[in-house]
Amino acid sequence: VVAQERSARTRQRLVHAAAVEIDENGYERATLTRICKYAQLSIGALTFHFNSKRDLADAVRADARALTNDRMKQVAHGHAPGLDCLIHLTGELAHLLETEVVVRSAARLERDCPGDGGWLESWLPAVRCLLREAQRSEELRPGVDPQVMTALAVHLVTGAETFARASAGGADPHLPAVATQLERMWEVVLRGAVATP
């Protein structure tokens, strides 16, 4: 049992180190040597747990999906389906991007190394479902296309990733948290920015 726990901790250290390396340098430029150095483990320990850099990236994605799924369940229990839940969900995604390197890394992997089971697919179906529910319950104005709103949500979360990565690197400390910025953007979108004549 002790050996299994130690093995699990070692594996988790490697996944975290891979997430840091991928977040900072991207998948292509990430090296197993730097991952081992950051984790303070040998290449032998890495190859015991993972056959390749791709396997490590898959483990990062899996951890990010698990964190995201847990957060989505929390949001779903606290809000009625529809736009309110959508706003809170995207805010929580932004918060995860800002605070969890494994999530930021998985988001970067979407661009660097697309594949099945990416981070986007862990939350995009919920966004689509919430927008269909918002349309059914007439929260959306007639003529508002849920697919366009889905694209907007994806763009907002993708933008949140950019700001989260910048803030992780020491961006302006006077800027509000990324989740707060995203919620303010939703307010502008939902209220409209144009004054009526």
Give each language-model segment a name.
Residues E121-S137, L156, T162-P197:
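C-terminal peripheral helix-coil segments that are non-catalytic and often amphipathic
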Residues G91-Q135, E139-L140, V148:
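Short secondary-structure transition hinges
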Residues A39-F50:
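Short hydrophobic/aromatic patch on the recognition helix
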Residues D84, G118-W119, R136-V154, P176-T180:
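All-alpha amphipathic helical-bundle segments outside canonical DNA-binding/catalytic cores
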Residues A62-T68:
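Short, basic, alpha-helical segments at the C-terminal edge of helix-turn-helix-like DNA-binding modules
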Residues F50, V60-R61:
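DNA major-groove recognition helix of helix-turn-helix
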Residues V1-N25, L32-Y38, R54-D58:
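Basic, helix-initiating cap at the start of DNA-binding domains
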Residues A59, D70-T99, V103, G115, ...:
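Hydrophobic alpha-helical connector segments
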